[in-house]
């Protein structure tokens, strides 16, 4: 596993939980002897929903809701077998979506 790289993408609606999870992953990887680059903040995806406040008419009266998806990227450059094993056992908070590419 000398030339391989592990790329971890994290997504969450709450940036505080996302940063805590990223720090746990970086700390675990560094403790097992791997070289880590990140967490790199990626652009926040913002989705806006516009709805009418009234049921029947009054189109001028609208309300907008937004949903923000925060993203982080972590690259583990030289993972050891111990790194992969410790990352598999890592317990992260709920609400964080994790994509791992080897």
Swiss-Prot record:
PROSITE patterns in alphabetical order: RIBOSOMAL_S10 (PS00361)
SMART domains: Ribosomal_S10
Subunit structure: Part of the 30S ribosomal subunit.
Protein name, UniProt field: Small ribosomal subunit protein uS10
BP GO annotations: translation
An example Gene Ontology molecular-function term: structural constituent of ribosome
Alphabetically ordered keywords of this record: Ribonucleoprotein, Ribosomal protein
InterPro entries, alphabetized: Ribosomal_uS10, Ribosomal_uS10_CS, Ribosomal_uS10_dom, Ribosomal_uS10_dom_sf
Gene symbol of the encoding locus: rpsJ
Function comment: Involved in the binding of tRNA to the ribosomes.
Family: Belongs to the universal ribosomal protein uS10 family.
GO cellular component: ribonucleoprotein complex; ribosome
Lineage of producing organism: Bacteria, Bacillati, Bacillota, Bacilli, Bacillales
């Amino acid at each position: 596993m000398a030339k391989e790289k592990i790329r971890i993408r994290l997504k969450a609606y709450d940036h505080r939980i996302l940063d805590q999870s990223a720090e746990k992953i970086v700390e675990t990887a560094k403790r097992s002897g791997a070289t880590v680059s990140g967490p790199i903040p990626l652009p926040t995806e913002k989705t806006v929903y516009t709805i009418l406040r009234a049921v029947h008419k009054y189109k001028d009266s609208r309300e907008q809701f937004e949903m923000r998806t925060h993203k982080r990227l972590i690259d583990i450059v030289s993972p050891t077998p111990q790194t992969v094993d410790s990352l598999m056992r890592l317990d992260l908070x709920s609400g964080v979506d994790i994509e791992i590419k080897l």
